[in-house]
Amino acid sequence: VSHTMGVDIVKLAHAAHKVIVCEYNRAQITQAWFKLKELPLIISNKPMPNGFHRQSEITRSESAKKVIAELKDKKIILYQGVVDVERPIESIAKAVEELDDSLVFMVMTGSKCEHLKKYRKTIMMPYIAAPYHLEVTSHAFVGILIYTPVYGTFTSPLNSIYCAPNKIYEFSQFGIPMIGNDIPGLRYTIEYNHMGVCVPKMNTKYFAQAIQNIADNYNTFSSNAVKFNQNDNKSEVVRLALKK
């Protein structure tokens, strides 16, 4: 109850016109937990049309604009988000360190990441307010998505296992291949649609192999990412939700 601010969410779900979630497995779990007669509708976390394109101009941060300009000949492995126990990324920094100098690892975060500053090819960048962070996203070579199930936090491990990150759509909008860890929410999006690689273990060896795999098959992964994004008809599901 504390997680729902005192609201009886089961009672609310039964009284609702439509119940909407953002991922297929979450729909199944919600129906089972709440004993709903109807499977909840699924509306993805795909951002609304935004006008950004590959290698967009950086307009909201002079420091970011300068960094991106300095990296114009580099291949950016990009992570954008919180860095914590649920999203450990040091193995990626180590992997990029071991690969050739055409690659750099960029971390855009508000988290303190002192442990990453020792890596020569890791670049830290502060947040840029949404949606303008997508200007930086548009310059990435590979996008990173990490969701590690943890216990003892206010959310269930299922929140990570059946993640539905908007990042999948932000990266795929630009045809950026992705690397994720091996959980259903990423395996059955990234790998199922052949738009990237899910590593079997979160270590330097597997991240390095994944980066090389994407580099060797870049056009295929990139094309599939664009198709995945274009095939998500969010507006149609919204229309369905509004029907009686």
Listing of model-derived features with the role each one plays in the protein:
Residues 107-142:
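Nucleotide-activated donor-binding/catalytic signature segment of Leloir-type glycosyltransferases, i.e.
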Residues 44, 53, 58-59, 201-203, ...:
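A charged, aromatic-enriched C-terminal amphipathic alpha-helix characteristic of glycosyltransferases
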